Amino acid sequence: MLPLLLPLQLLLLMVMKGGHGCQGPELDRELVLAKVRALVLDALGPPNASKDGGKPVAQRLTRRHAHTGGSTRRSMENEDEDLSQVILFPTTGPGCEDEPEARAAEGLFTYTFRPSLHTRSRQVTAAQLWFHTGLDKVGAEVHNDSGPMVTLLAMSSGGPMAVPILLGPAPPHWAVLHLAAPAFTLLTRPLLVLLLRCPNCPCPAQLDATPFLVAHTRARPPSVGERARRSPLPPPWPWSPAALRLLQRPSEDPAAHADCHRAALNISFQELGWDQWIVHPPSFIFHYCHGGCGLVPSPVLSPGAALTPSQPLPLGPGSRPCCAAMPSTMRPLRVRTTSDGGYSFKYEIVPNLLTQHCACI
């Protein structure tokens, strides 16, 4: 029996430290907010102050896009669109020391890219290949008597195929190759092999001269069948402010919350004072464990039997059970933050924040 008590006591200490439980019969909203603040700050750290005096994100983004001719309403709608920018570095490149002289004179460089599963699952809206040419001006020497100076090929099952590109403005010693829309599907491959031909370009041996791909993506719109599956069923009751208040505060009946249960609280980041830092989601449902356990007898388990979330864990003699989250059932909260007022965003995760199952532990 003694070898079994030690891991159970350690489990109890872990739950009392990290779980959301062991609260009194009445739980104040400010106490829950303070707990959420501590968990978020412990995971993300304190927010960075905006360099422009903390101007509202919506106003700054609207002003930034005003010169494009779009309406303010359209700019506000674009803020909620799931956009991302990915930079891909090659996993393998040409070995400049071992490069054959014939290929080096031809200026043919081979690079292998491995787009992530996240990138392949999204819709590419723009893509550029940045390549270090070592030349001051590439745009003036794009065409010569023998044809284009920089060409791009992609390996396929049928052999190399030409990739349509457009040479755009670039800093000195670099070339920016904008891929045409038909070439966006290349980034949906798990393995992408590009062959770049630049006869007058030296082999980029230095690390800061490594080429890279820049992909702008957005969430792929769901198909008709997916939209039908994802469409939530209408609630059996009409939504009203009274229903929202039920989520924001516990029931007035103490008996309904006397036993151990999973409670819910609607928390907005504006209420926490972080709406200029955490911009998405604007609010979330915080689940936590609440209620008493009473005098719950320890269950007698047969060898190999598993506990269910509704069963109390066996404790040592004299131990008092606590209503807390079941270990390994906490879920993270994914948020999008900004530290410069909306000019750039960062996707972050607050781990072990949302309770899934409660039990008397």
Swiss-Prot record:
List the cysteine pairs that form cystine: C260-C323, C289-C358, C293-C360
Q: Name one GO molecular function term.
A: growth factor activity
Q: Gene Ontology cellular component?
A: extracellular space
Q: Where is this region: Disordered?
A: 45-82
| Secreted is among the record's keywords | yes
A GO BP term here is: hemoglobin biosynthetic process
The feature of type site (Cleavage) is located at: R64, H65, R230, S231
- Superkingdom, taxonomy of origin: Eukaryota
- Which residues are sugar-modified? N48, N144, N266
Question: Where's it found, cell-wise?
Answer: Secreted
- Look up the signal peptide feature and give its range: 1-21
InterPro entries recorded: Cystine-knot_cytokine (IPR029034), Inhibin_asu (IPR017175), TGF-b_C (IPR001839), TGF-beta-rel (IPR015615), TGFb_CS (IPR017948)
Q: How is it modified after translation?
A: Proteolytic processing yields a number of bioactive forms, consisting either solely of the mature alpha chain, of the most N-terminal propeptide linked through a disulfide bond to the mature alpha chain, or of the entire proprotein.
Q: Which UniProt keywords apply?
A: Cleavage on pair of basic residues, Disulfide bond, Glycoprotein, Growth factor, Hormone, Secreted, Signal
Q: Which family does it belong to?
A: Belongs to the TGF-beta family.
Cross-referenced PANTHER family: INHIBIN ALPHA CHAIN (PTHR11848:SF117), TGF-BETA FAMILY (PTHR11848)
Please describe the quaternary structure of this protein: Dimeric, linked by one or more disulfide bonds. Activin B is a dimer of alpha and beta-B. Inhibin A is a dimer of alpha and beta-A. Inhibin B is a dimer of alpha and beta-B. Interacts with TGFBR3L; this interaction regulates female fertility.
The free-text function statement in the UniProt record for this protein reads: Inhibins and activins inhibit and activate, respectively, the secretion of follitropin by the pituitary gland. Inhibins/activins are involved in regulating a number of diverse functions such as hypothalamic and pituitary hormone secretion, gonadal hormone secretion, germ cell development and maturation, erythroid differentiation, insulin secretion, nerve cell survival, embryonic axial development or bone growth, depending on their subunit composition. Inhibins appear to oppose the functions of activins. Inhibin A is a dimer of alpha/INHA and beta-A/INHBA that functions as a feedback regulator in the hypothalamic-pituitary-gonadal (HPG) axis. Inhibits the secretion of FSH from the anterior pituitary gland by acting on pituitary gonadotrope cells. Antagonizes activin A by binding to the proteoglycan, betaglycan, and forming a stable complex with and, thereby, sequestering type II activin receptors while excluding type I receptor.
Output this protein's name. Inhibin alpha chain
Q: What organism is recorded for this protein? A: Trichosurus vulpecula (Brush-tailed possum)
Q: Which gene encodes it?
A: INHA
